[in-house]
């Protein structure tokens, strides 16, 4: 029995059969069931995923914990996760998302525990890099994917950008814009988010070749616009950096503080949120380094689904999304 023969029996195309047997694409549930029934009846031996699906027909409940409240960057991460879940709904996959605000370990732990209590089969989480979160994730009997930022736990994979590389790209841009001399203030969300700290490490590494450019401050804003405004307003009252590099969210609030200061400060950002694009259009942010948030959400759900049904892990346990520089007139 071949894919072509299954397609003929099901009255559909070979491409549709391939998508069903390989868990790709959004196929009508009735048609997907008909294809799987034919494959099972004819003892077709497809790839490992299809064998598992035919054998078990199990429902898959995936949980996700994301600090998206008040942080528009994560809107695209959530859209990606929901999009993939819809595509996999034909295979009995459901997705439950717990949205939290900020970087409080107790809040994150509570959200994860609630999902586990609801009986999720797998968990995707943007984890805080603190001992209590690591210990909890390590203790779970279900597969875990870390999304957007990573920590040292036994997980199926990390899905997100290479933050160190992102920081180095920012450092390259700083060198180009400051012409070899200047003072820089970096703004991160939290020292408990490894990705934010990796960006700062990458920035410092890139600037090692230009010793007259210094990173004089690393400010925390909890990825919150109000906190960002207050922190930068206080800092700028006593300091005048040549450049501010945002390495996380809270950019809208931080920009308000910079503009209110009246000081001539150049700005680099990360991500492509509405606020960042608006300030770029106005010429107030020179460039931003993006990281494909939609793909992060999409891949996190896909990786967990594949692992549950086939046991496959991504190579080296990493699924990296692309870091790209975007300027005002980028397409």
PLM regions: where:
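N-terminal helix-turn-helix DNA-binding module of bacterial transcription factors
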Residues: 1-54
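Amphipathic helical "hinge" segments at domain boundaries
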Residues: 48-107
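Short, solvent-exposed amphipathic alpha-helices that sit
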Residues: 73-88, 166-170, 194-213, 227, ...
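Short beta-strand elements in bilobed, periplasmic/extracellular small-molecule ligand-binding domains
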Residues: 86-107, 185-186, 204-226
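Hydrophobic alpha-helical
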Residues: 110, 122-138, 203, 220-277
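Flexible loop/hinge segments that line or gate small-molecule binding clefts
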Residues: 128-165, 273-281
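Hydrophobic alpha-helical segments within soluble ligand-binding/sensing domains
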Residues: 158-184, 228-229, 274-276, 292-309
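Hinge/cleft segment of the Venus flytrap/periplasmic-binding protein
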Residues: 207, 292-331
């Amino acid at each position: 029995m071949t894919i072509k023969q299954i397609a003929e029996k099901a009255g559909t195309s070979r491409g549709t059969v391939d998508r069903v047997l390989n868990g790709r694409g959004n196929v009508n549930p009735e048609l997907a069931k008909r294809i799987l029934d034919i494959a099972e009846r004819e003892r077709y031996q497809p790839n490992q995923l299809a064998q598992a699906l035919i054998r078990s027909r199990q429902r898959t409940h995936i949980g996700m914990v994301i600090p998206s409240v008040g942080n528009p960057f994560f809107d695209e991460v959530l859209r990606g996760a929901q999009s993939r879940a819809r595509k996999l709904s034909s295979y009995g996959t459901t997705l439950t998302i717990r949205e939290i605000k900020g970087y409080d370990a107790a809040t994150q732990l509570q959200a994860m525990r609630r999902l586990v209590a609801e009986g999720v089969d797998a968990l995707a989480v943007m984890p805080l890099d603190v001992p209590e979160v690591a210990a909890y994730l390590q203790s779970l009997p279900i597969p875990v994917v870390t999304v957007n930022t990573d920590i040292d736990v036994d997980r199926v994979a990390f899905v997100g950008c290479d933050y160190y590389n992102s920081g180095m790209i920012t450092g390259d841009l700083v060198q180009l814009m400051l012409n070899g001399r200047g003072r820089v203030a970096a703004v991160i969300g939290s020292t408990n988010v490894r990705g934010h700290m990796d960006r700062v490490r990458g920035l410092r590494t890139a600037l090692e070749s230009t010793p007259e450019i210094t990173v004089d401050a690393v400010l925390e804003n909890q990825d919150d616009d109000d906190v960002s405004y207050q922190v930068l307003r206080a800092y700028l009252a006593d300091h005048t950096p040549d450049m501010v590099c945002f390495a996380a969210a809270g950019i809208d609030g931080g920009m308000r503080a910079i503009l209110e200061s009246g000081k001539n400060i150049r700005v680099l950002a990360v991500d492509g949120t509405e606020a960042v694009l608006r300030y770029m259009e106005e010429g107030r942010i020179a460039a931003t380094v993006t990281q494909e948030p939609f793909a992060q959400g999409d891949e996190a759900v896909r990786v967990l689904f594949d692992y549950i049904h086939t046991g496959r892990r991504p190579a080296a346990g990493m699924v990296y999304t692309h870091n790209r520089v975007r300027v005002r007139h980028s397409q």
